[in-house]
Regions:
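NTP/phosphate- and nucleic-acid-binding module
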Residues: 1-211
């Protein structure tokens, strides 16, 4: 899975239903102050357009909540405990890297906003890197294309004539079909030949197996 690891999802902030989750770690003697800080930070984040949730469920321990929100892929987790409260700060954890830092409450929204941008950029870069690693462009011939699709799997970008017969031939021999037609610099150059039949290509197609 592109946006996942052994602990669950790693959702890009722009797609995540909750971009930030705040987990108060409160004992009876400081519970009111911690919940007040959580509410203030949440309000500041919402004012900047961040989708945030406070997980103040009393029936679950903090460790359970950490694991649950990691599984669901929430990009940033904020922890607020007694030490954070005393320091006038919160502890912020990135889902993608696990990096943890303490951030002062005044101006926390700006720091967390920058962190969300960094998470978005990091996940996008890793997704592009993974796609490139698993993509065969301009195979030397039809046999190489079929061997690649039958093997470890991935994507093949190759010129296509536009005929359904060619797509069906590839499907019969590799179970792969055309997933999309790129509209960028990878479009078929003038004079290119179809990878399947050798006829003039009309476009570049991306072939892959569906799962």
């Amino acid at each position: 899975m592109t946006h996942g690891d052994d602990r669950g999802l790693r959702l890009p902030p722009r797609l995540a239903p909750h971009q930030v989750v705040i987990v108060p770690i409160a004992r009876d003697d400081d519970r009111a102050g911690i919940l007040e800080t959580a509410a203030a930070v949440a309000e500041e984040l919402r004012a900047t357009g961040v989708r945030v949730r406070i997980d103040d469920r009393a029936e679950h321990r903090p460790g359970f909540k950490f694991n649950e929100w990691e599984l669901k892929g929430v990009p940033v987790r904020i922890e607020i405990g007694s030490r954070d409260l005393a320091a006038g700060a919160v502890t912020v954890v990135r889902r993608d890297t696990g990096a943890k830092q303490q951030v002062a409450v005044p101006g926390a929204a700006a720091v967390i906003g920058e962190m969300l941008d960094a998470v978005q950029a990091s996940l996008f870069a890793s997704a592009v890197e993974e796609r490139e690693r698993r993509t065969l462009r301009d195979p030397r011939g039809y046999d190489e294309m079929i061997e690649f699709l039958r093997g470890a799997g991935g994507f093949v970008e190759a010129p296509w004539c536009g005929r359904a017969e060619c797509e069906e031939r590839v499907k019969e021999q590799s179970s792969a079909t055309i997933r999309c037609l790129p509209l960028d610099e990878h479009s078929a150059p003038p004079g290119g030949a179809c990878i399947c039949c050798g006829r003039p290509a009309v476009t570049t197609a991306v072939w892959a197996q569906a799962y």
